[in-house]
Amino acid sequence: MRKLFISMVLALSTYMIQAQEDGVYSMHFLRVEGNTDDFEKVQSMYMQKVAKQAAEKGDIPFCAFLKHVPMDNIDDEERYNYVFVQSNTSIEALLSEKNSWWNNAADVLSSEEQALVSALSATHTWKADSRHIYSDEGSIAKGLGGFIQFNFARPENVDGFIQENLTLWKPYFEKTMDSMGMVNWGVGRKLAPLDANWAKVSTWDMFNTLEELMNYRIGYKLPANLLKKSKMKDHNPDGFMMMSIFQMIANSAQ
């Protein structure tokens, strides 16, 4: 038991050190019901100002507000329909009070703006939420696009999955992403929560337009020489458990 405990501590320490080196990010998924247009107004017109000031002060590197793209017009699946994605330079920064930038709204927004936020917020309800923390294992950031695909998986070999993405696919996308409209790519390792129902890793592919993203999904063929080198069928035999598309609504860089 003592050896097992020591092994667990060493493994957690390795993850924490890696997160300190490469940064971490959180994905806060929401289920919002009611007048979602008003919810989007609150986030894009008012809370974006608060997030932007936090980024300019150096409290956070970046925060984005995104909307799920369901591909139909009837919201009957009761799934999460929004997500906040926020990056931090370290675990310490993630746990800092400065990371809760929304608490500064009263210092940033005028009295009139705060009153409008209160009125708009009365028209919708947060019905459910779930926050997930990842370490950024490696990414390519050439810009911010309008649409992003998040890919979640539970690979049998997490280290193998991540290393193949870094050594095989990252160099490939660095050379080819411009031609397909991809502006951002990366792979993350799940830090929390960890259980049998959650993904262990996440990758992302961001594009300028939804059309470019969909063309990537259905019409892009990976080169045969790289596929021969790939061991992803061994690392992740079940493939991705979910591939969700989100639209950028607002971010702290605007």
Features from the language model and the residues they span:
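Short S/T/G/P-rich N-terminal loop/turn motif that feeds into the first structured element of a domain
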Residues: 19-108, 115-254
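Bacterial Sec-dependent N-terminal signal peptides
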Residues: 1-22
